[in-house]
Amino acid sequence: TLYFIFGIWSGLLGTSLSLMIRSELGKPGTLLNDDQLYNVVVTAHGFIMIFFLVMPIMIGGFGNWLVPLMLGAPDMAFPRMNNMSFWLLPPSLTLLLSSSAVESGAGTGWTVYPPLSSNLSHAGPSVDLAIFSLHLAGVSSILGAINFITTILNMRWEGLQMERLPLFVWSVFITAILLLLSXPVLAGAITMLLTDRNFNTTFFDPSGGGDPILYQHLF
């Protein structure tokens, strides 16, 4: 239920950002009169809709409720980890909102793509806060994925083979595996970006021998 409440609230927030984007693009000239502000809205819209609407509702809400039901299991394999998975999301959203409040916001697009996310374009802590927000959301996703995979593999009714599982359970299972493979790679990319911004490394800076396209591949 908490997942649903959180997801609905985030969905309303995301929808209001969506309306702002549509209003800006739906008529000639500008409505916001500020390109940076528009970019911040687009970035926040992407993050909120993915990490705070789709994942909490589709996976957190429906997944946690339907998967054990369809397996004949009393609960998820790790209920407390499930709880922790949820409670990482509110601080993550708080960090994302604070990233839009400090300096002029993180106007990088939702991929946080360098060089737009470098110190030259965003000198203050806004991009760093957005990266920390992504880290927390990613940890939450990984915990959830481990929980789902363990539940589906180990907590089925006796005689319920994998090929007899409902397609919804299969879809959650495959999504969780893909998430477990991809989320650490994304975490690596944004951590490298974080060190590029704060510790003078040059992972993505060609002037220091880095590869400007590497981030794109990792993402």
From Swiss-Prot:
User: Which free-text remark accompanies the cofactor?
Assistant: Binds 2 heme A groups non-covalently per subunit.
What Gene3D superfamilies has UniProt attached to this entry? Cytochrome c oxidase-like, subunit I domain
How does the record classify its membrane topology?
A: Multi-pass membrane protein
Cofactor dependency: heme; Cu cation
Residues exposed to the Mitochondrial intermembrane side? 23-46, 107-128, 188-219
Tell me which SUPFAM superfamilies the record gives: Cytochrome c oxidase subunit I-like
One annotated GO biological process: mitochondrial electron transport, cytochrome c to oxygen
Q: What is this protein called?
A: Cytochrome c oxidase subunit 1
State the species of origin: Acanthosepion pharaonis
Q: What is the lineage of its organism?
A: Eukaryota, Metazoa, Spiralia, Lophotrochozoa, Mollusca
Q: What gene codes for this chain?
A: COI
